[in-house]
Amino acid sequence: MARFTNQAQLRYGNAVTNSNVAVGEILEVLSATKTAVKTTYGQNDTVTYIISIVNSGATAFNGLTLTDDLGAYTFGTGTVTPLTYIPGTINYYINGTLQTAPTVEAGPPLTVSGISVPANGNATIIYETAVNEFAPFATGSDVVNTARITGGGITPITISETIAAESTPILNITKSVSPVPVTENGILTYTFLIQNMGSAPAAVTTGATIT
């Protein structure tokens, strides 16, 4: 809640006196939340986000823009995004009624423009993202996804949601053959390289089998 202060000054002849400082608060009528349907992620997962915008005032807001950083973070000298917007997955509701899809730029960042929120009503934007190769999977890793709502004469609203990496083994296997080429009736040697890209060891009880 924003606060403001105000002070008066009284001059009478050569005398000057200041009043007390009056403090007021501005009640923002527009609020928003961001929620992930699933609070954890794994390799090649899909994560669905729900943005809820509530207008508690008597005036509608039009022309709002939602900008989502898709979890962007600094890597080396650049910036990478661990989530990729899945085209065509935007659903936009006003007071629970599905609307025509707004204008979407996949980014990154993801930009959704042309959002309206009626007086004493709400708007909901739902969309899906795919976990990509820049997502961290080590134990304790997470993706912090931040969105910003601007336009329509409002004070910008920033909202975020954090999802955690699943503690699970993620196995990849590569097969190679030697020698290449091989003479007729020669002997071949096959080599399997198994890598665990996950955040937990693959124990014997996991039951990994090569066929």
What residues fall within each predicted segment?
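Exported/extracytosolic protein signature
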Residues: 1-211
